[in-house]
């Protein structure tokens, strides 16, 4: 349905030379294809790693997001790692509700890893059942 996934490897040396503080990569939709190479070659910049796929309406579970974060931490130091979506959520057919739940999963997945690392967790009122958009009673 989508074009063949392209490797970032041929561009990494040039991206490392770009006058920017952060370089972002679509890694969720590629199955983390180049994550090891990104961590090895992008050494002086912060690295944004996509842990949410904008190509699909399927909402990632917090556990899936946490798995992607753990994989990223094997290659990119935590102090240079930024977690993000692969791209914006403006694709045709992506409702605000889908984007909302995808971002909630990003926060909850991040909190799973932060807890494992003994770091403080971020409040996520959107995941609190009392603020749910879905009627439960």
Language-model features, listed with the residues they occupy:
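Domain-level signal for soluble alpha/beta catalytic cores
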Residues: 1-137
């Amino acid at each position: 349905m989508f074009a063949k996934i392209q490797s970032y490897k041929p561009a990494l040396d040039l991206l490392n030379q770009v006058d920017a503080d952060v370089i972002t990569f679509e890694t969720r939709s590629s199955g983390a294809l180049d994550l090891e190479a990104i961590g090895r070659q992008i050494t002086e910049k912060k690295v944004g790693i996509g842990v949410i796929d904008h190509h699909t309406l399927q909402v990632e579970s917090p556990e899936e997001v946490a798995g992607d974060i753990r994989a990223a931490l094997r290659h990119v130091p935590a102090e240079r790692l930024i977690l993000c979506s692969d791209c914006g959520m403006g694709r045709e057919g992506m409702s605000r509700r889908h984007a909302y739940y995808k971002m909630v999963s990003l926060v909850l997945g991040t909190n799973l890893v932060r807890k494992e690392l003994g770091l403080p967790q971020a409040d996520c009122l959107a995941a609190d059942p009392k603020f749910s958009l879905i009627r439960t009673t």
